[in-house]
Amino acid sequence: EEIIDVAYQSPEMEVGFNVSYLLDVLNTLKCERVRFNLVDASSSCLIEDCDNSTAEYVIMPMRL
């Protein structure tokens, strides 16, 4: 289990991801900051580089 710092301004939610999929995306982006676009804890998550949105990745959360 990893806990990361986020800038989040909406109601609290808990979401989990398969670490292999998440690491694949993060290793591909190779940037300092990423943006996770979430609607709710069960919908797909769009991940992109904060400074360059030319590449977008979608991963599905796991049920907790």
UniProtKB/Swiss-Prot annotation:
Chain's role: Confers DNA tethering and processivity to DNA polymerases and other proteins. Acts as a clamp, forming a ring around DNA (a reaction catalyzed by the clamp-loading complex) which diffuses in an ATP-independent manner freely and bidirectionally along dsDNA. Initially characterized for its ability to contact the catalytic subunit of DNA polymerase III (Pol III), a complex, multichain enzyme responsible for most of the replicative synthesis in bacteria; Pol III exhibits 3'-5' exonuclease proofreading activity.
Assembly description: Forms a ring-shaped head-to-tail homodimer around DNA which binds and tethers DNA polymerases and other proteins to the DNA. The DNA replisome complex has a single clamp-loading complex (3 tau and 1 each of delta, delta', psi and chi subunits) which binds 3 Pol III cores (1 core on the leading strand and 2 on the lagging strand) each with a beta sliding clamp dimer. Additional proteins in the replisome are other copies of gamma, psi and chi, Ssb, DNA helicase and RNA primase.
PANTHER family in the cross-refs: BETA SLIDING CLAMP, DNA POLYMERASE III SUBUNIT BETA
InterPro entries: DNA_clamp_sf, DNA_polIII_beta, DNA_polIII_beta_C
A molecular function GO annotation: 3'-5' exonuclease activity
Name this polypeptide is given: Beta sliding clamp
Keywords, sorted A to Z: Cytoplasm, DNA replication, DNA-binding, DNA-directed DNA polymerase, Nucleotidyltransferase, Transferase
Cellular localisation: Cytoplasm
UniProt GO BP: DNA strand elongation involved in DNA replication
Family: Belongs to the beta sliding clamp family.
Keyword hit for Nucleotidyltransferase: yes
Organism: Actinobacillus pleuropneumoniae
GO cellular component, one term: cytoplasm
